[in-house]
Amino acid sequence: MKLPKISIITTSYTMDRFKDITELLDSLQAQSYKNIEIIVVAERSPELAENIRNYAQKKDYPNVVVLYNQGEWGLSSARNLGIGQASGEIIAFVDDDALLFPNWAEETARAYAEDSTIVGLTGPILPLWEDKSMSWSPREFYWIFSCTYWDWTKPAEVRNGYGTNISFRREAFDLCGSFKTNLGAKGGGESGKHELGGEETEFSLRVRRQTHKRIVYHPNIKVKHKVYRYRLSNSFIRKRAYWEGYTKAMFGRLYHSNDEAVLSTEHELLHRIFSRLIPSSLKLVFSQPGVALRQLWVTILVLACVATGYLSYTISNLFHHSEGYIVG
């Protein structure tokens, strides 16, 4: 069985992430499967691009290609630049502050080779806390810092994966184009600021509908994602949750189908929050009151902000026909 070549794309925009990138590159070079190509797309910082090149040369990493995005800034634009340079049959995306398990590439290549109905793969994104005291955060809200809340032990078909750990066959881009450049972070998402996200969700929806193939969550394709303390601040959570609600309302309208409940993933998560998270947090009130109160507070904050974002899009669409946001 011939295994495919994998092009792995990561993007970054600031020297503050240089150490993270070097650690990511080291984890990529430690992969058990060697038929990989690594493409790093830097933007907004020529110094960053130069430092990454120097690091790859110093460490003798010949499979590392460093590009500089001189066009429109943003995660989607940078990824699209990388896609244009990729030579692999599989094109994968990881965040610059992620670390891959040593068998990540091997498991990815094998999964594609064994099942031609799979057009995309994703897998567990495990939080690597800056401080262990942050681990009180409920799993149901791991999506706030781009980690997965799924705890499945067997492969399962999903609507989409997270950009911290996602890949597609080349045919997905040949048939469906690239990421929409008006979606996705424009500055790393540090503040959770005013920006439409959901670029992986939107692309995944297009790919599944046009190829009629599956996107699969595979429990053995694992990465760790660094979670810095700022991501648990009220300000970050509030903005991140608002825009999550806004973009999901947009997708629910624009990709509505009688054959598929586009927001079924969110509906299942909401049910889990009310049936599992809230009761378990209430049980902790007497034994671990600090943890219980933090969990209940973040639950209220997230639900309120997601609802506000959802209603904001819904109301604005009545007057401004917001489907124009998806074009680009």
Go through each PLM region and give its residues:
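N-proximal low-complexity "stem/linker" segments adjacent to membrane-targeting elements
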Residues: M1-Q29
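Glycine-rich, basic loop-to-helix element that forms the pyrophosphate-binding segment
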Residues: N69-A86
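Acidic donor-binding segment of Leloir-type glycosyltransferases
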Residues: L25-Y68
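A short, conserved alpha-helix in the catalytic core of glycosyltransferases
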Residues: N165-F168, A172-G177, L183-I221
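Non-catalytic, C-terminal membrane-associated alpha-helical segments of glycosyltransferases
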Residues: R240-W243, S257-G328
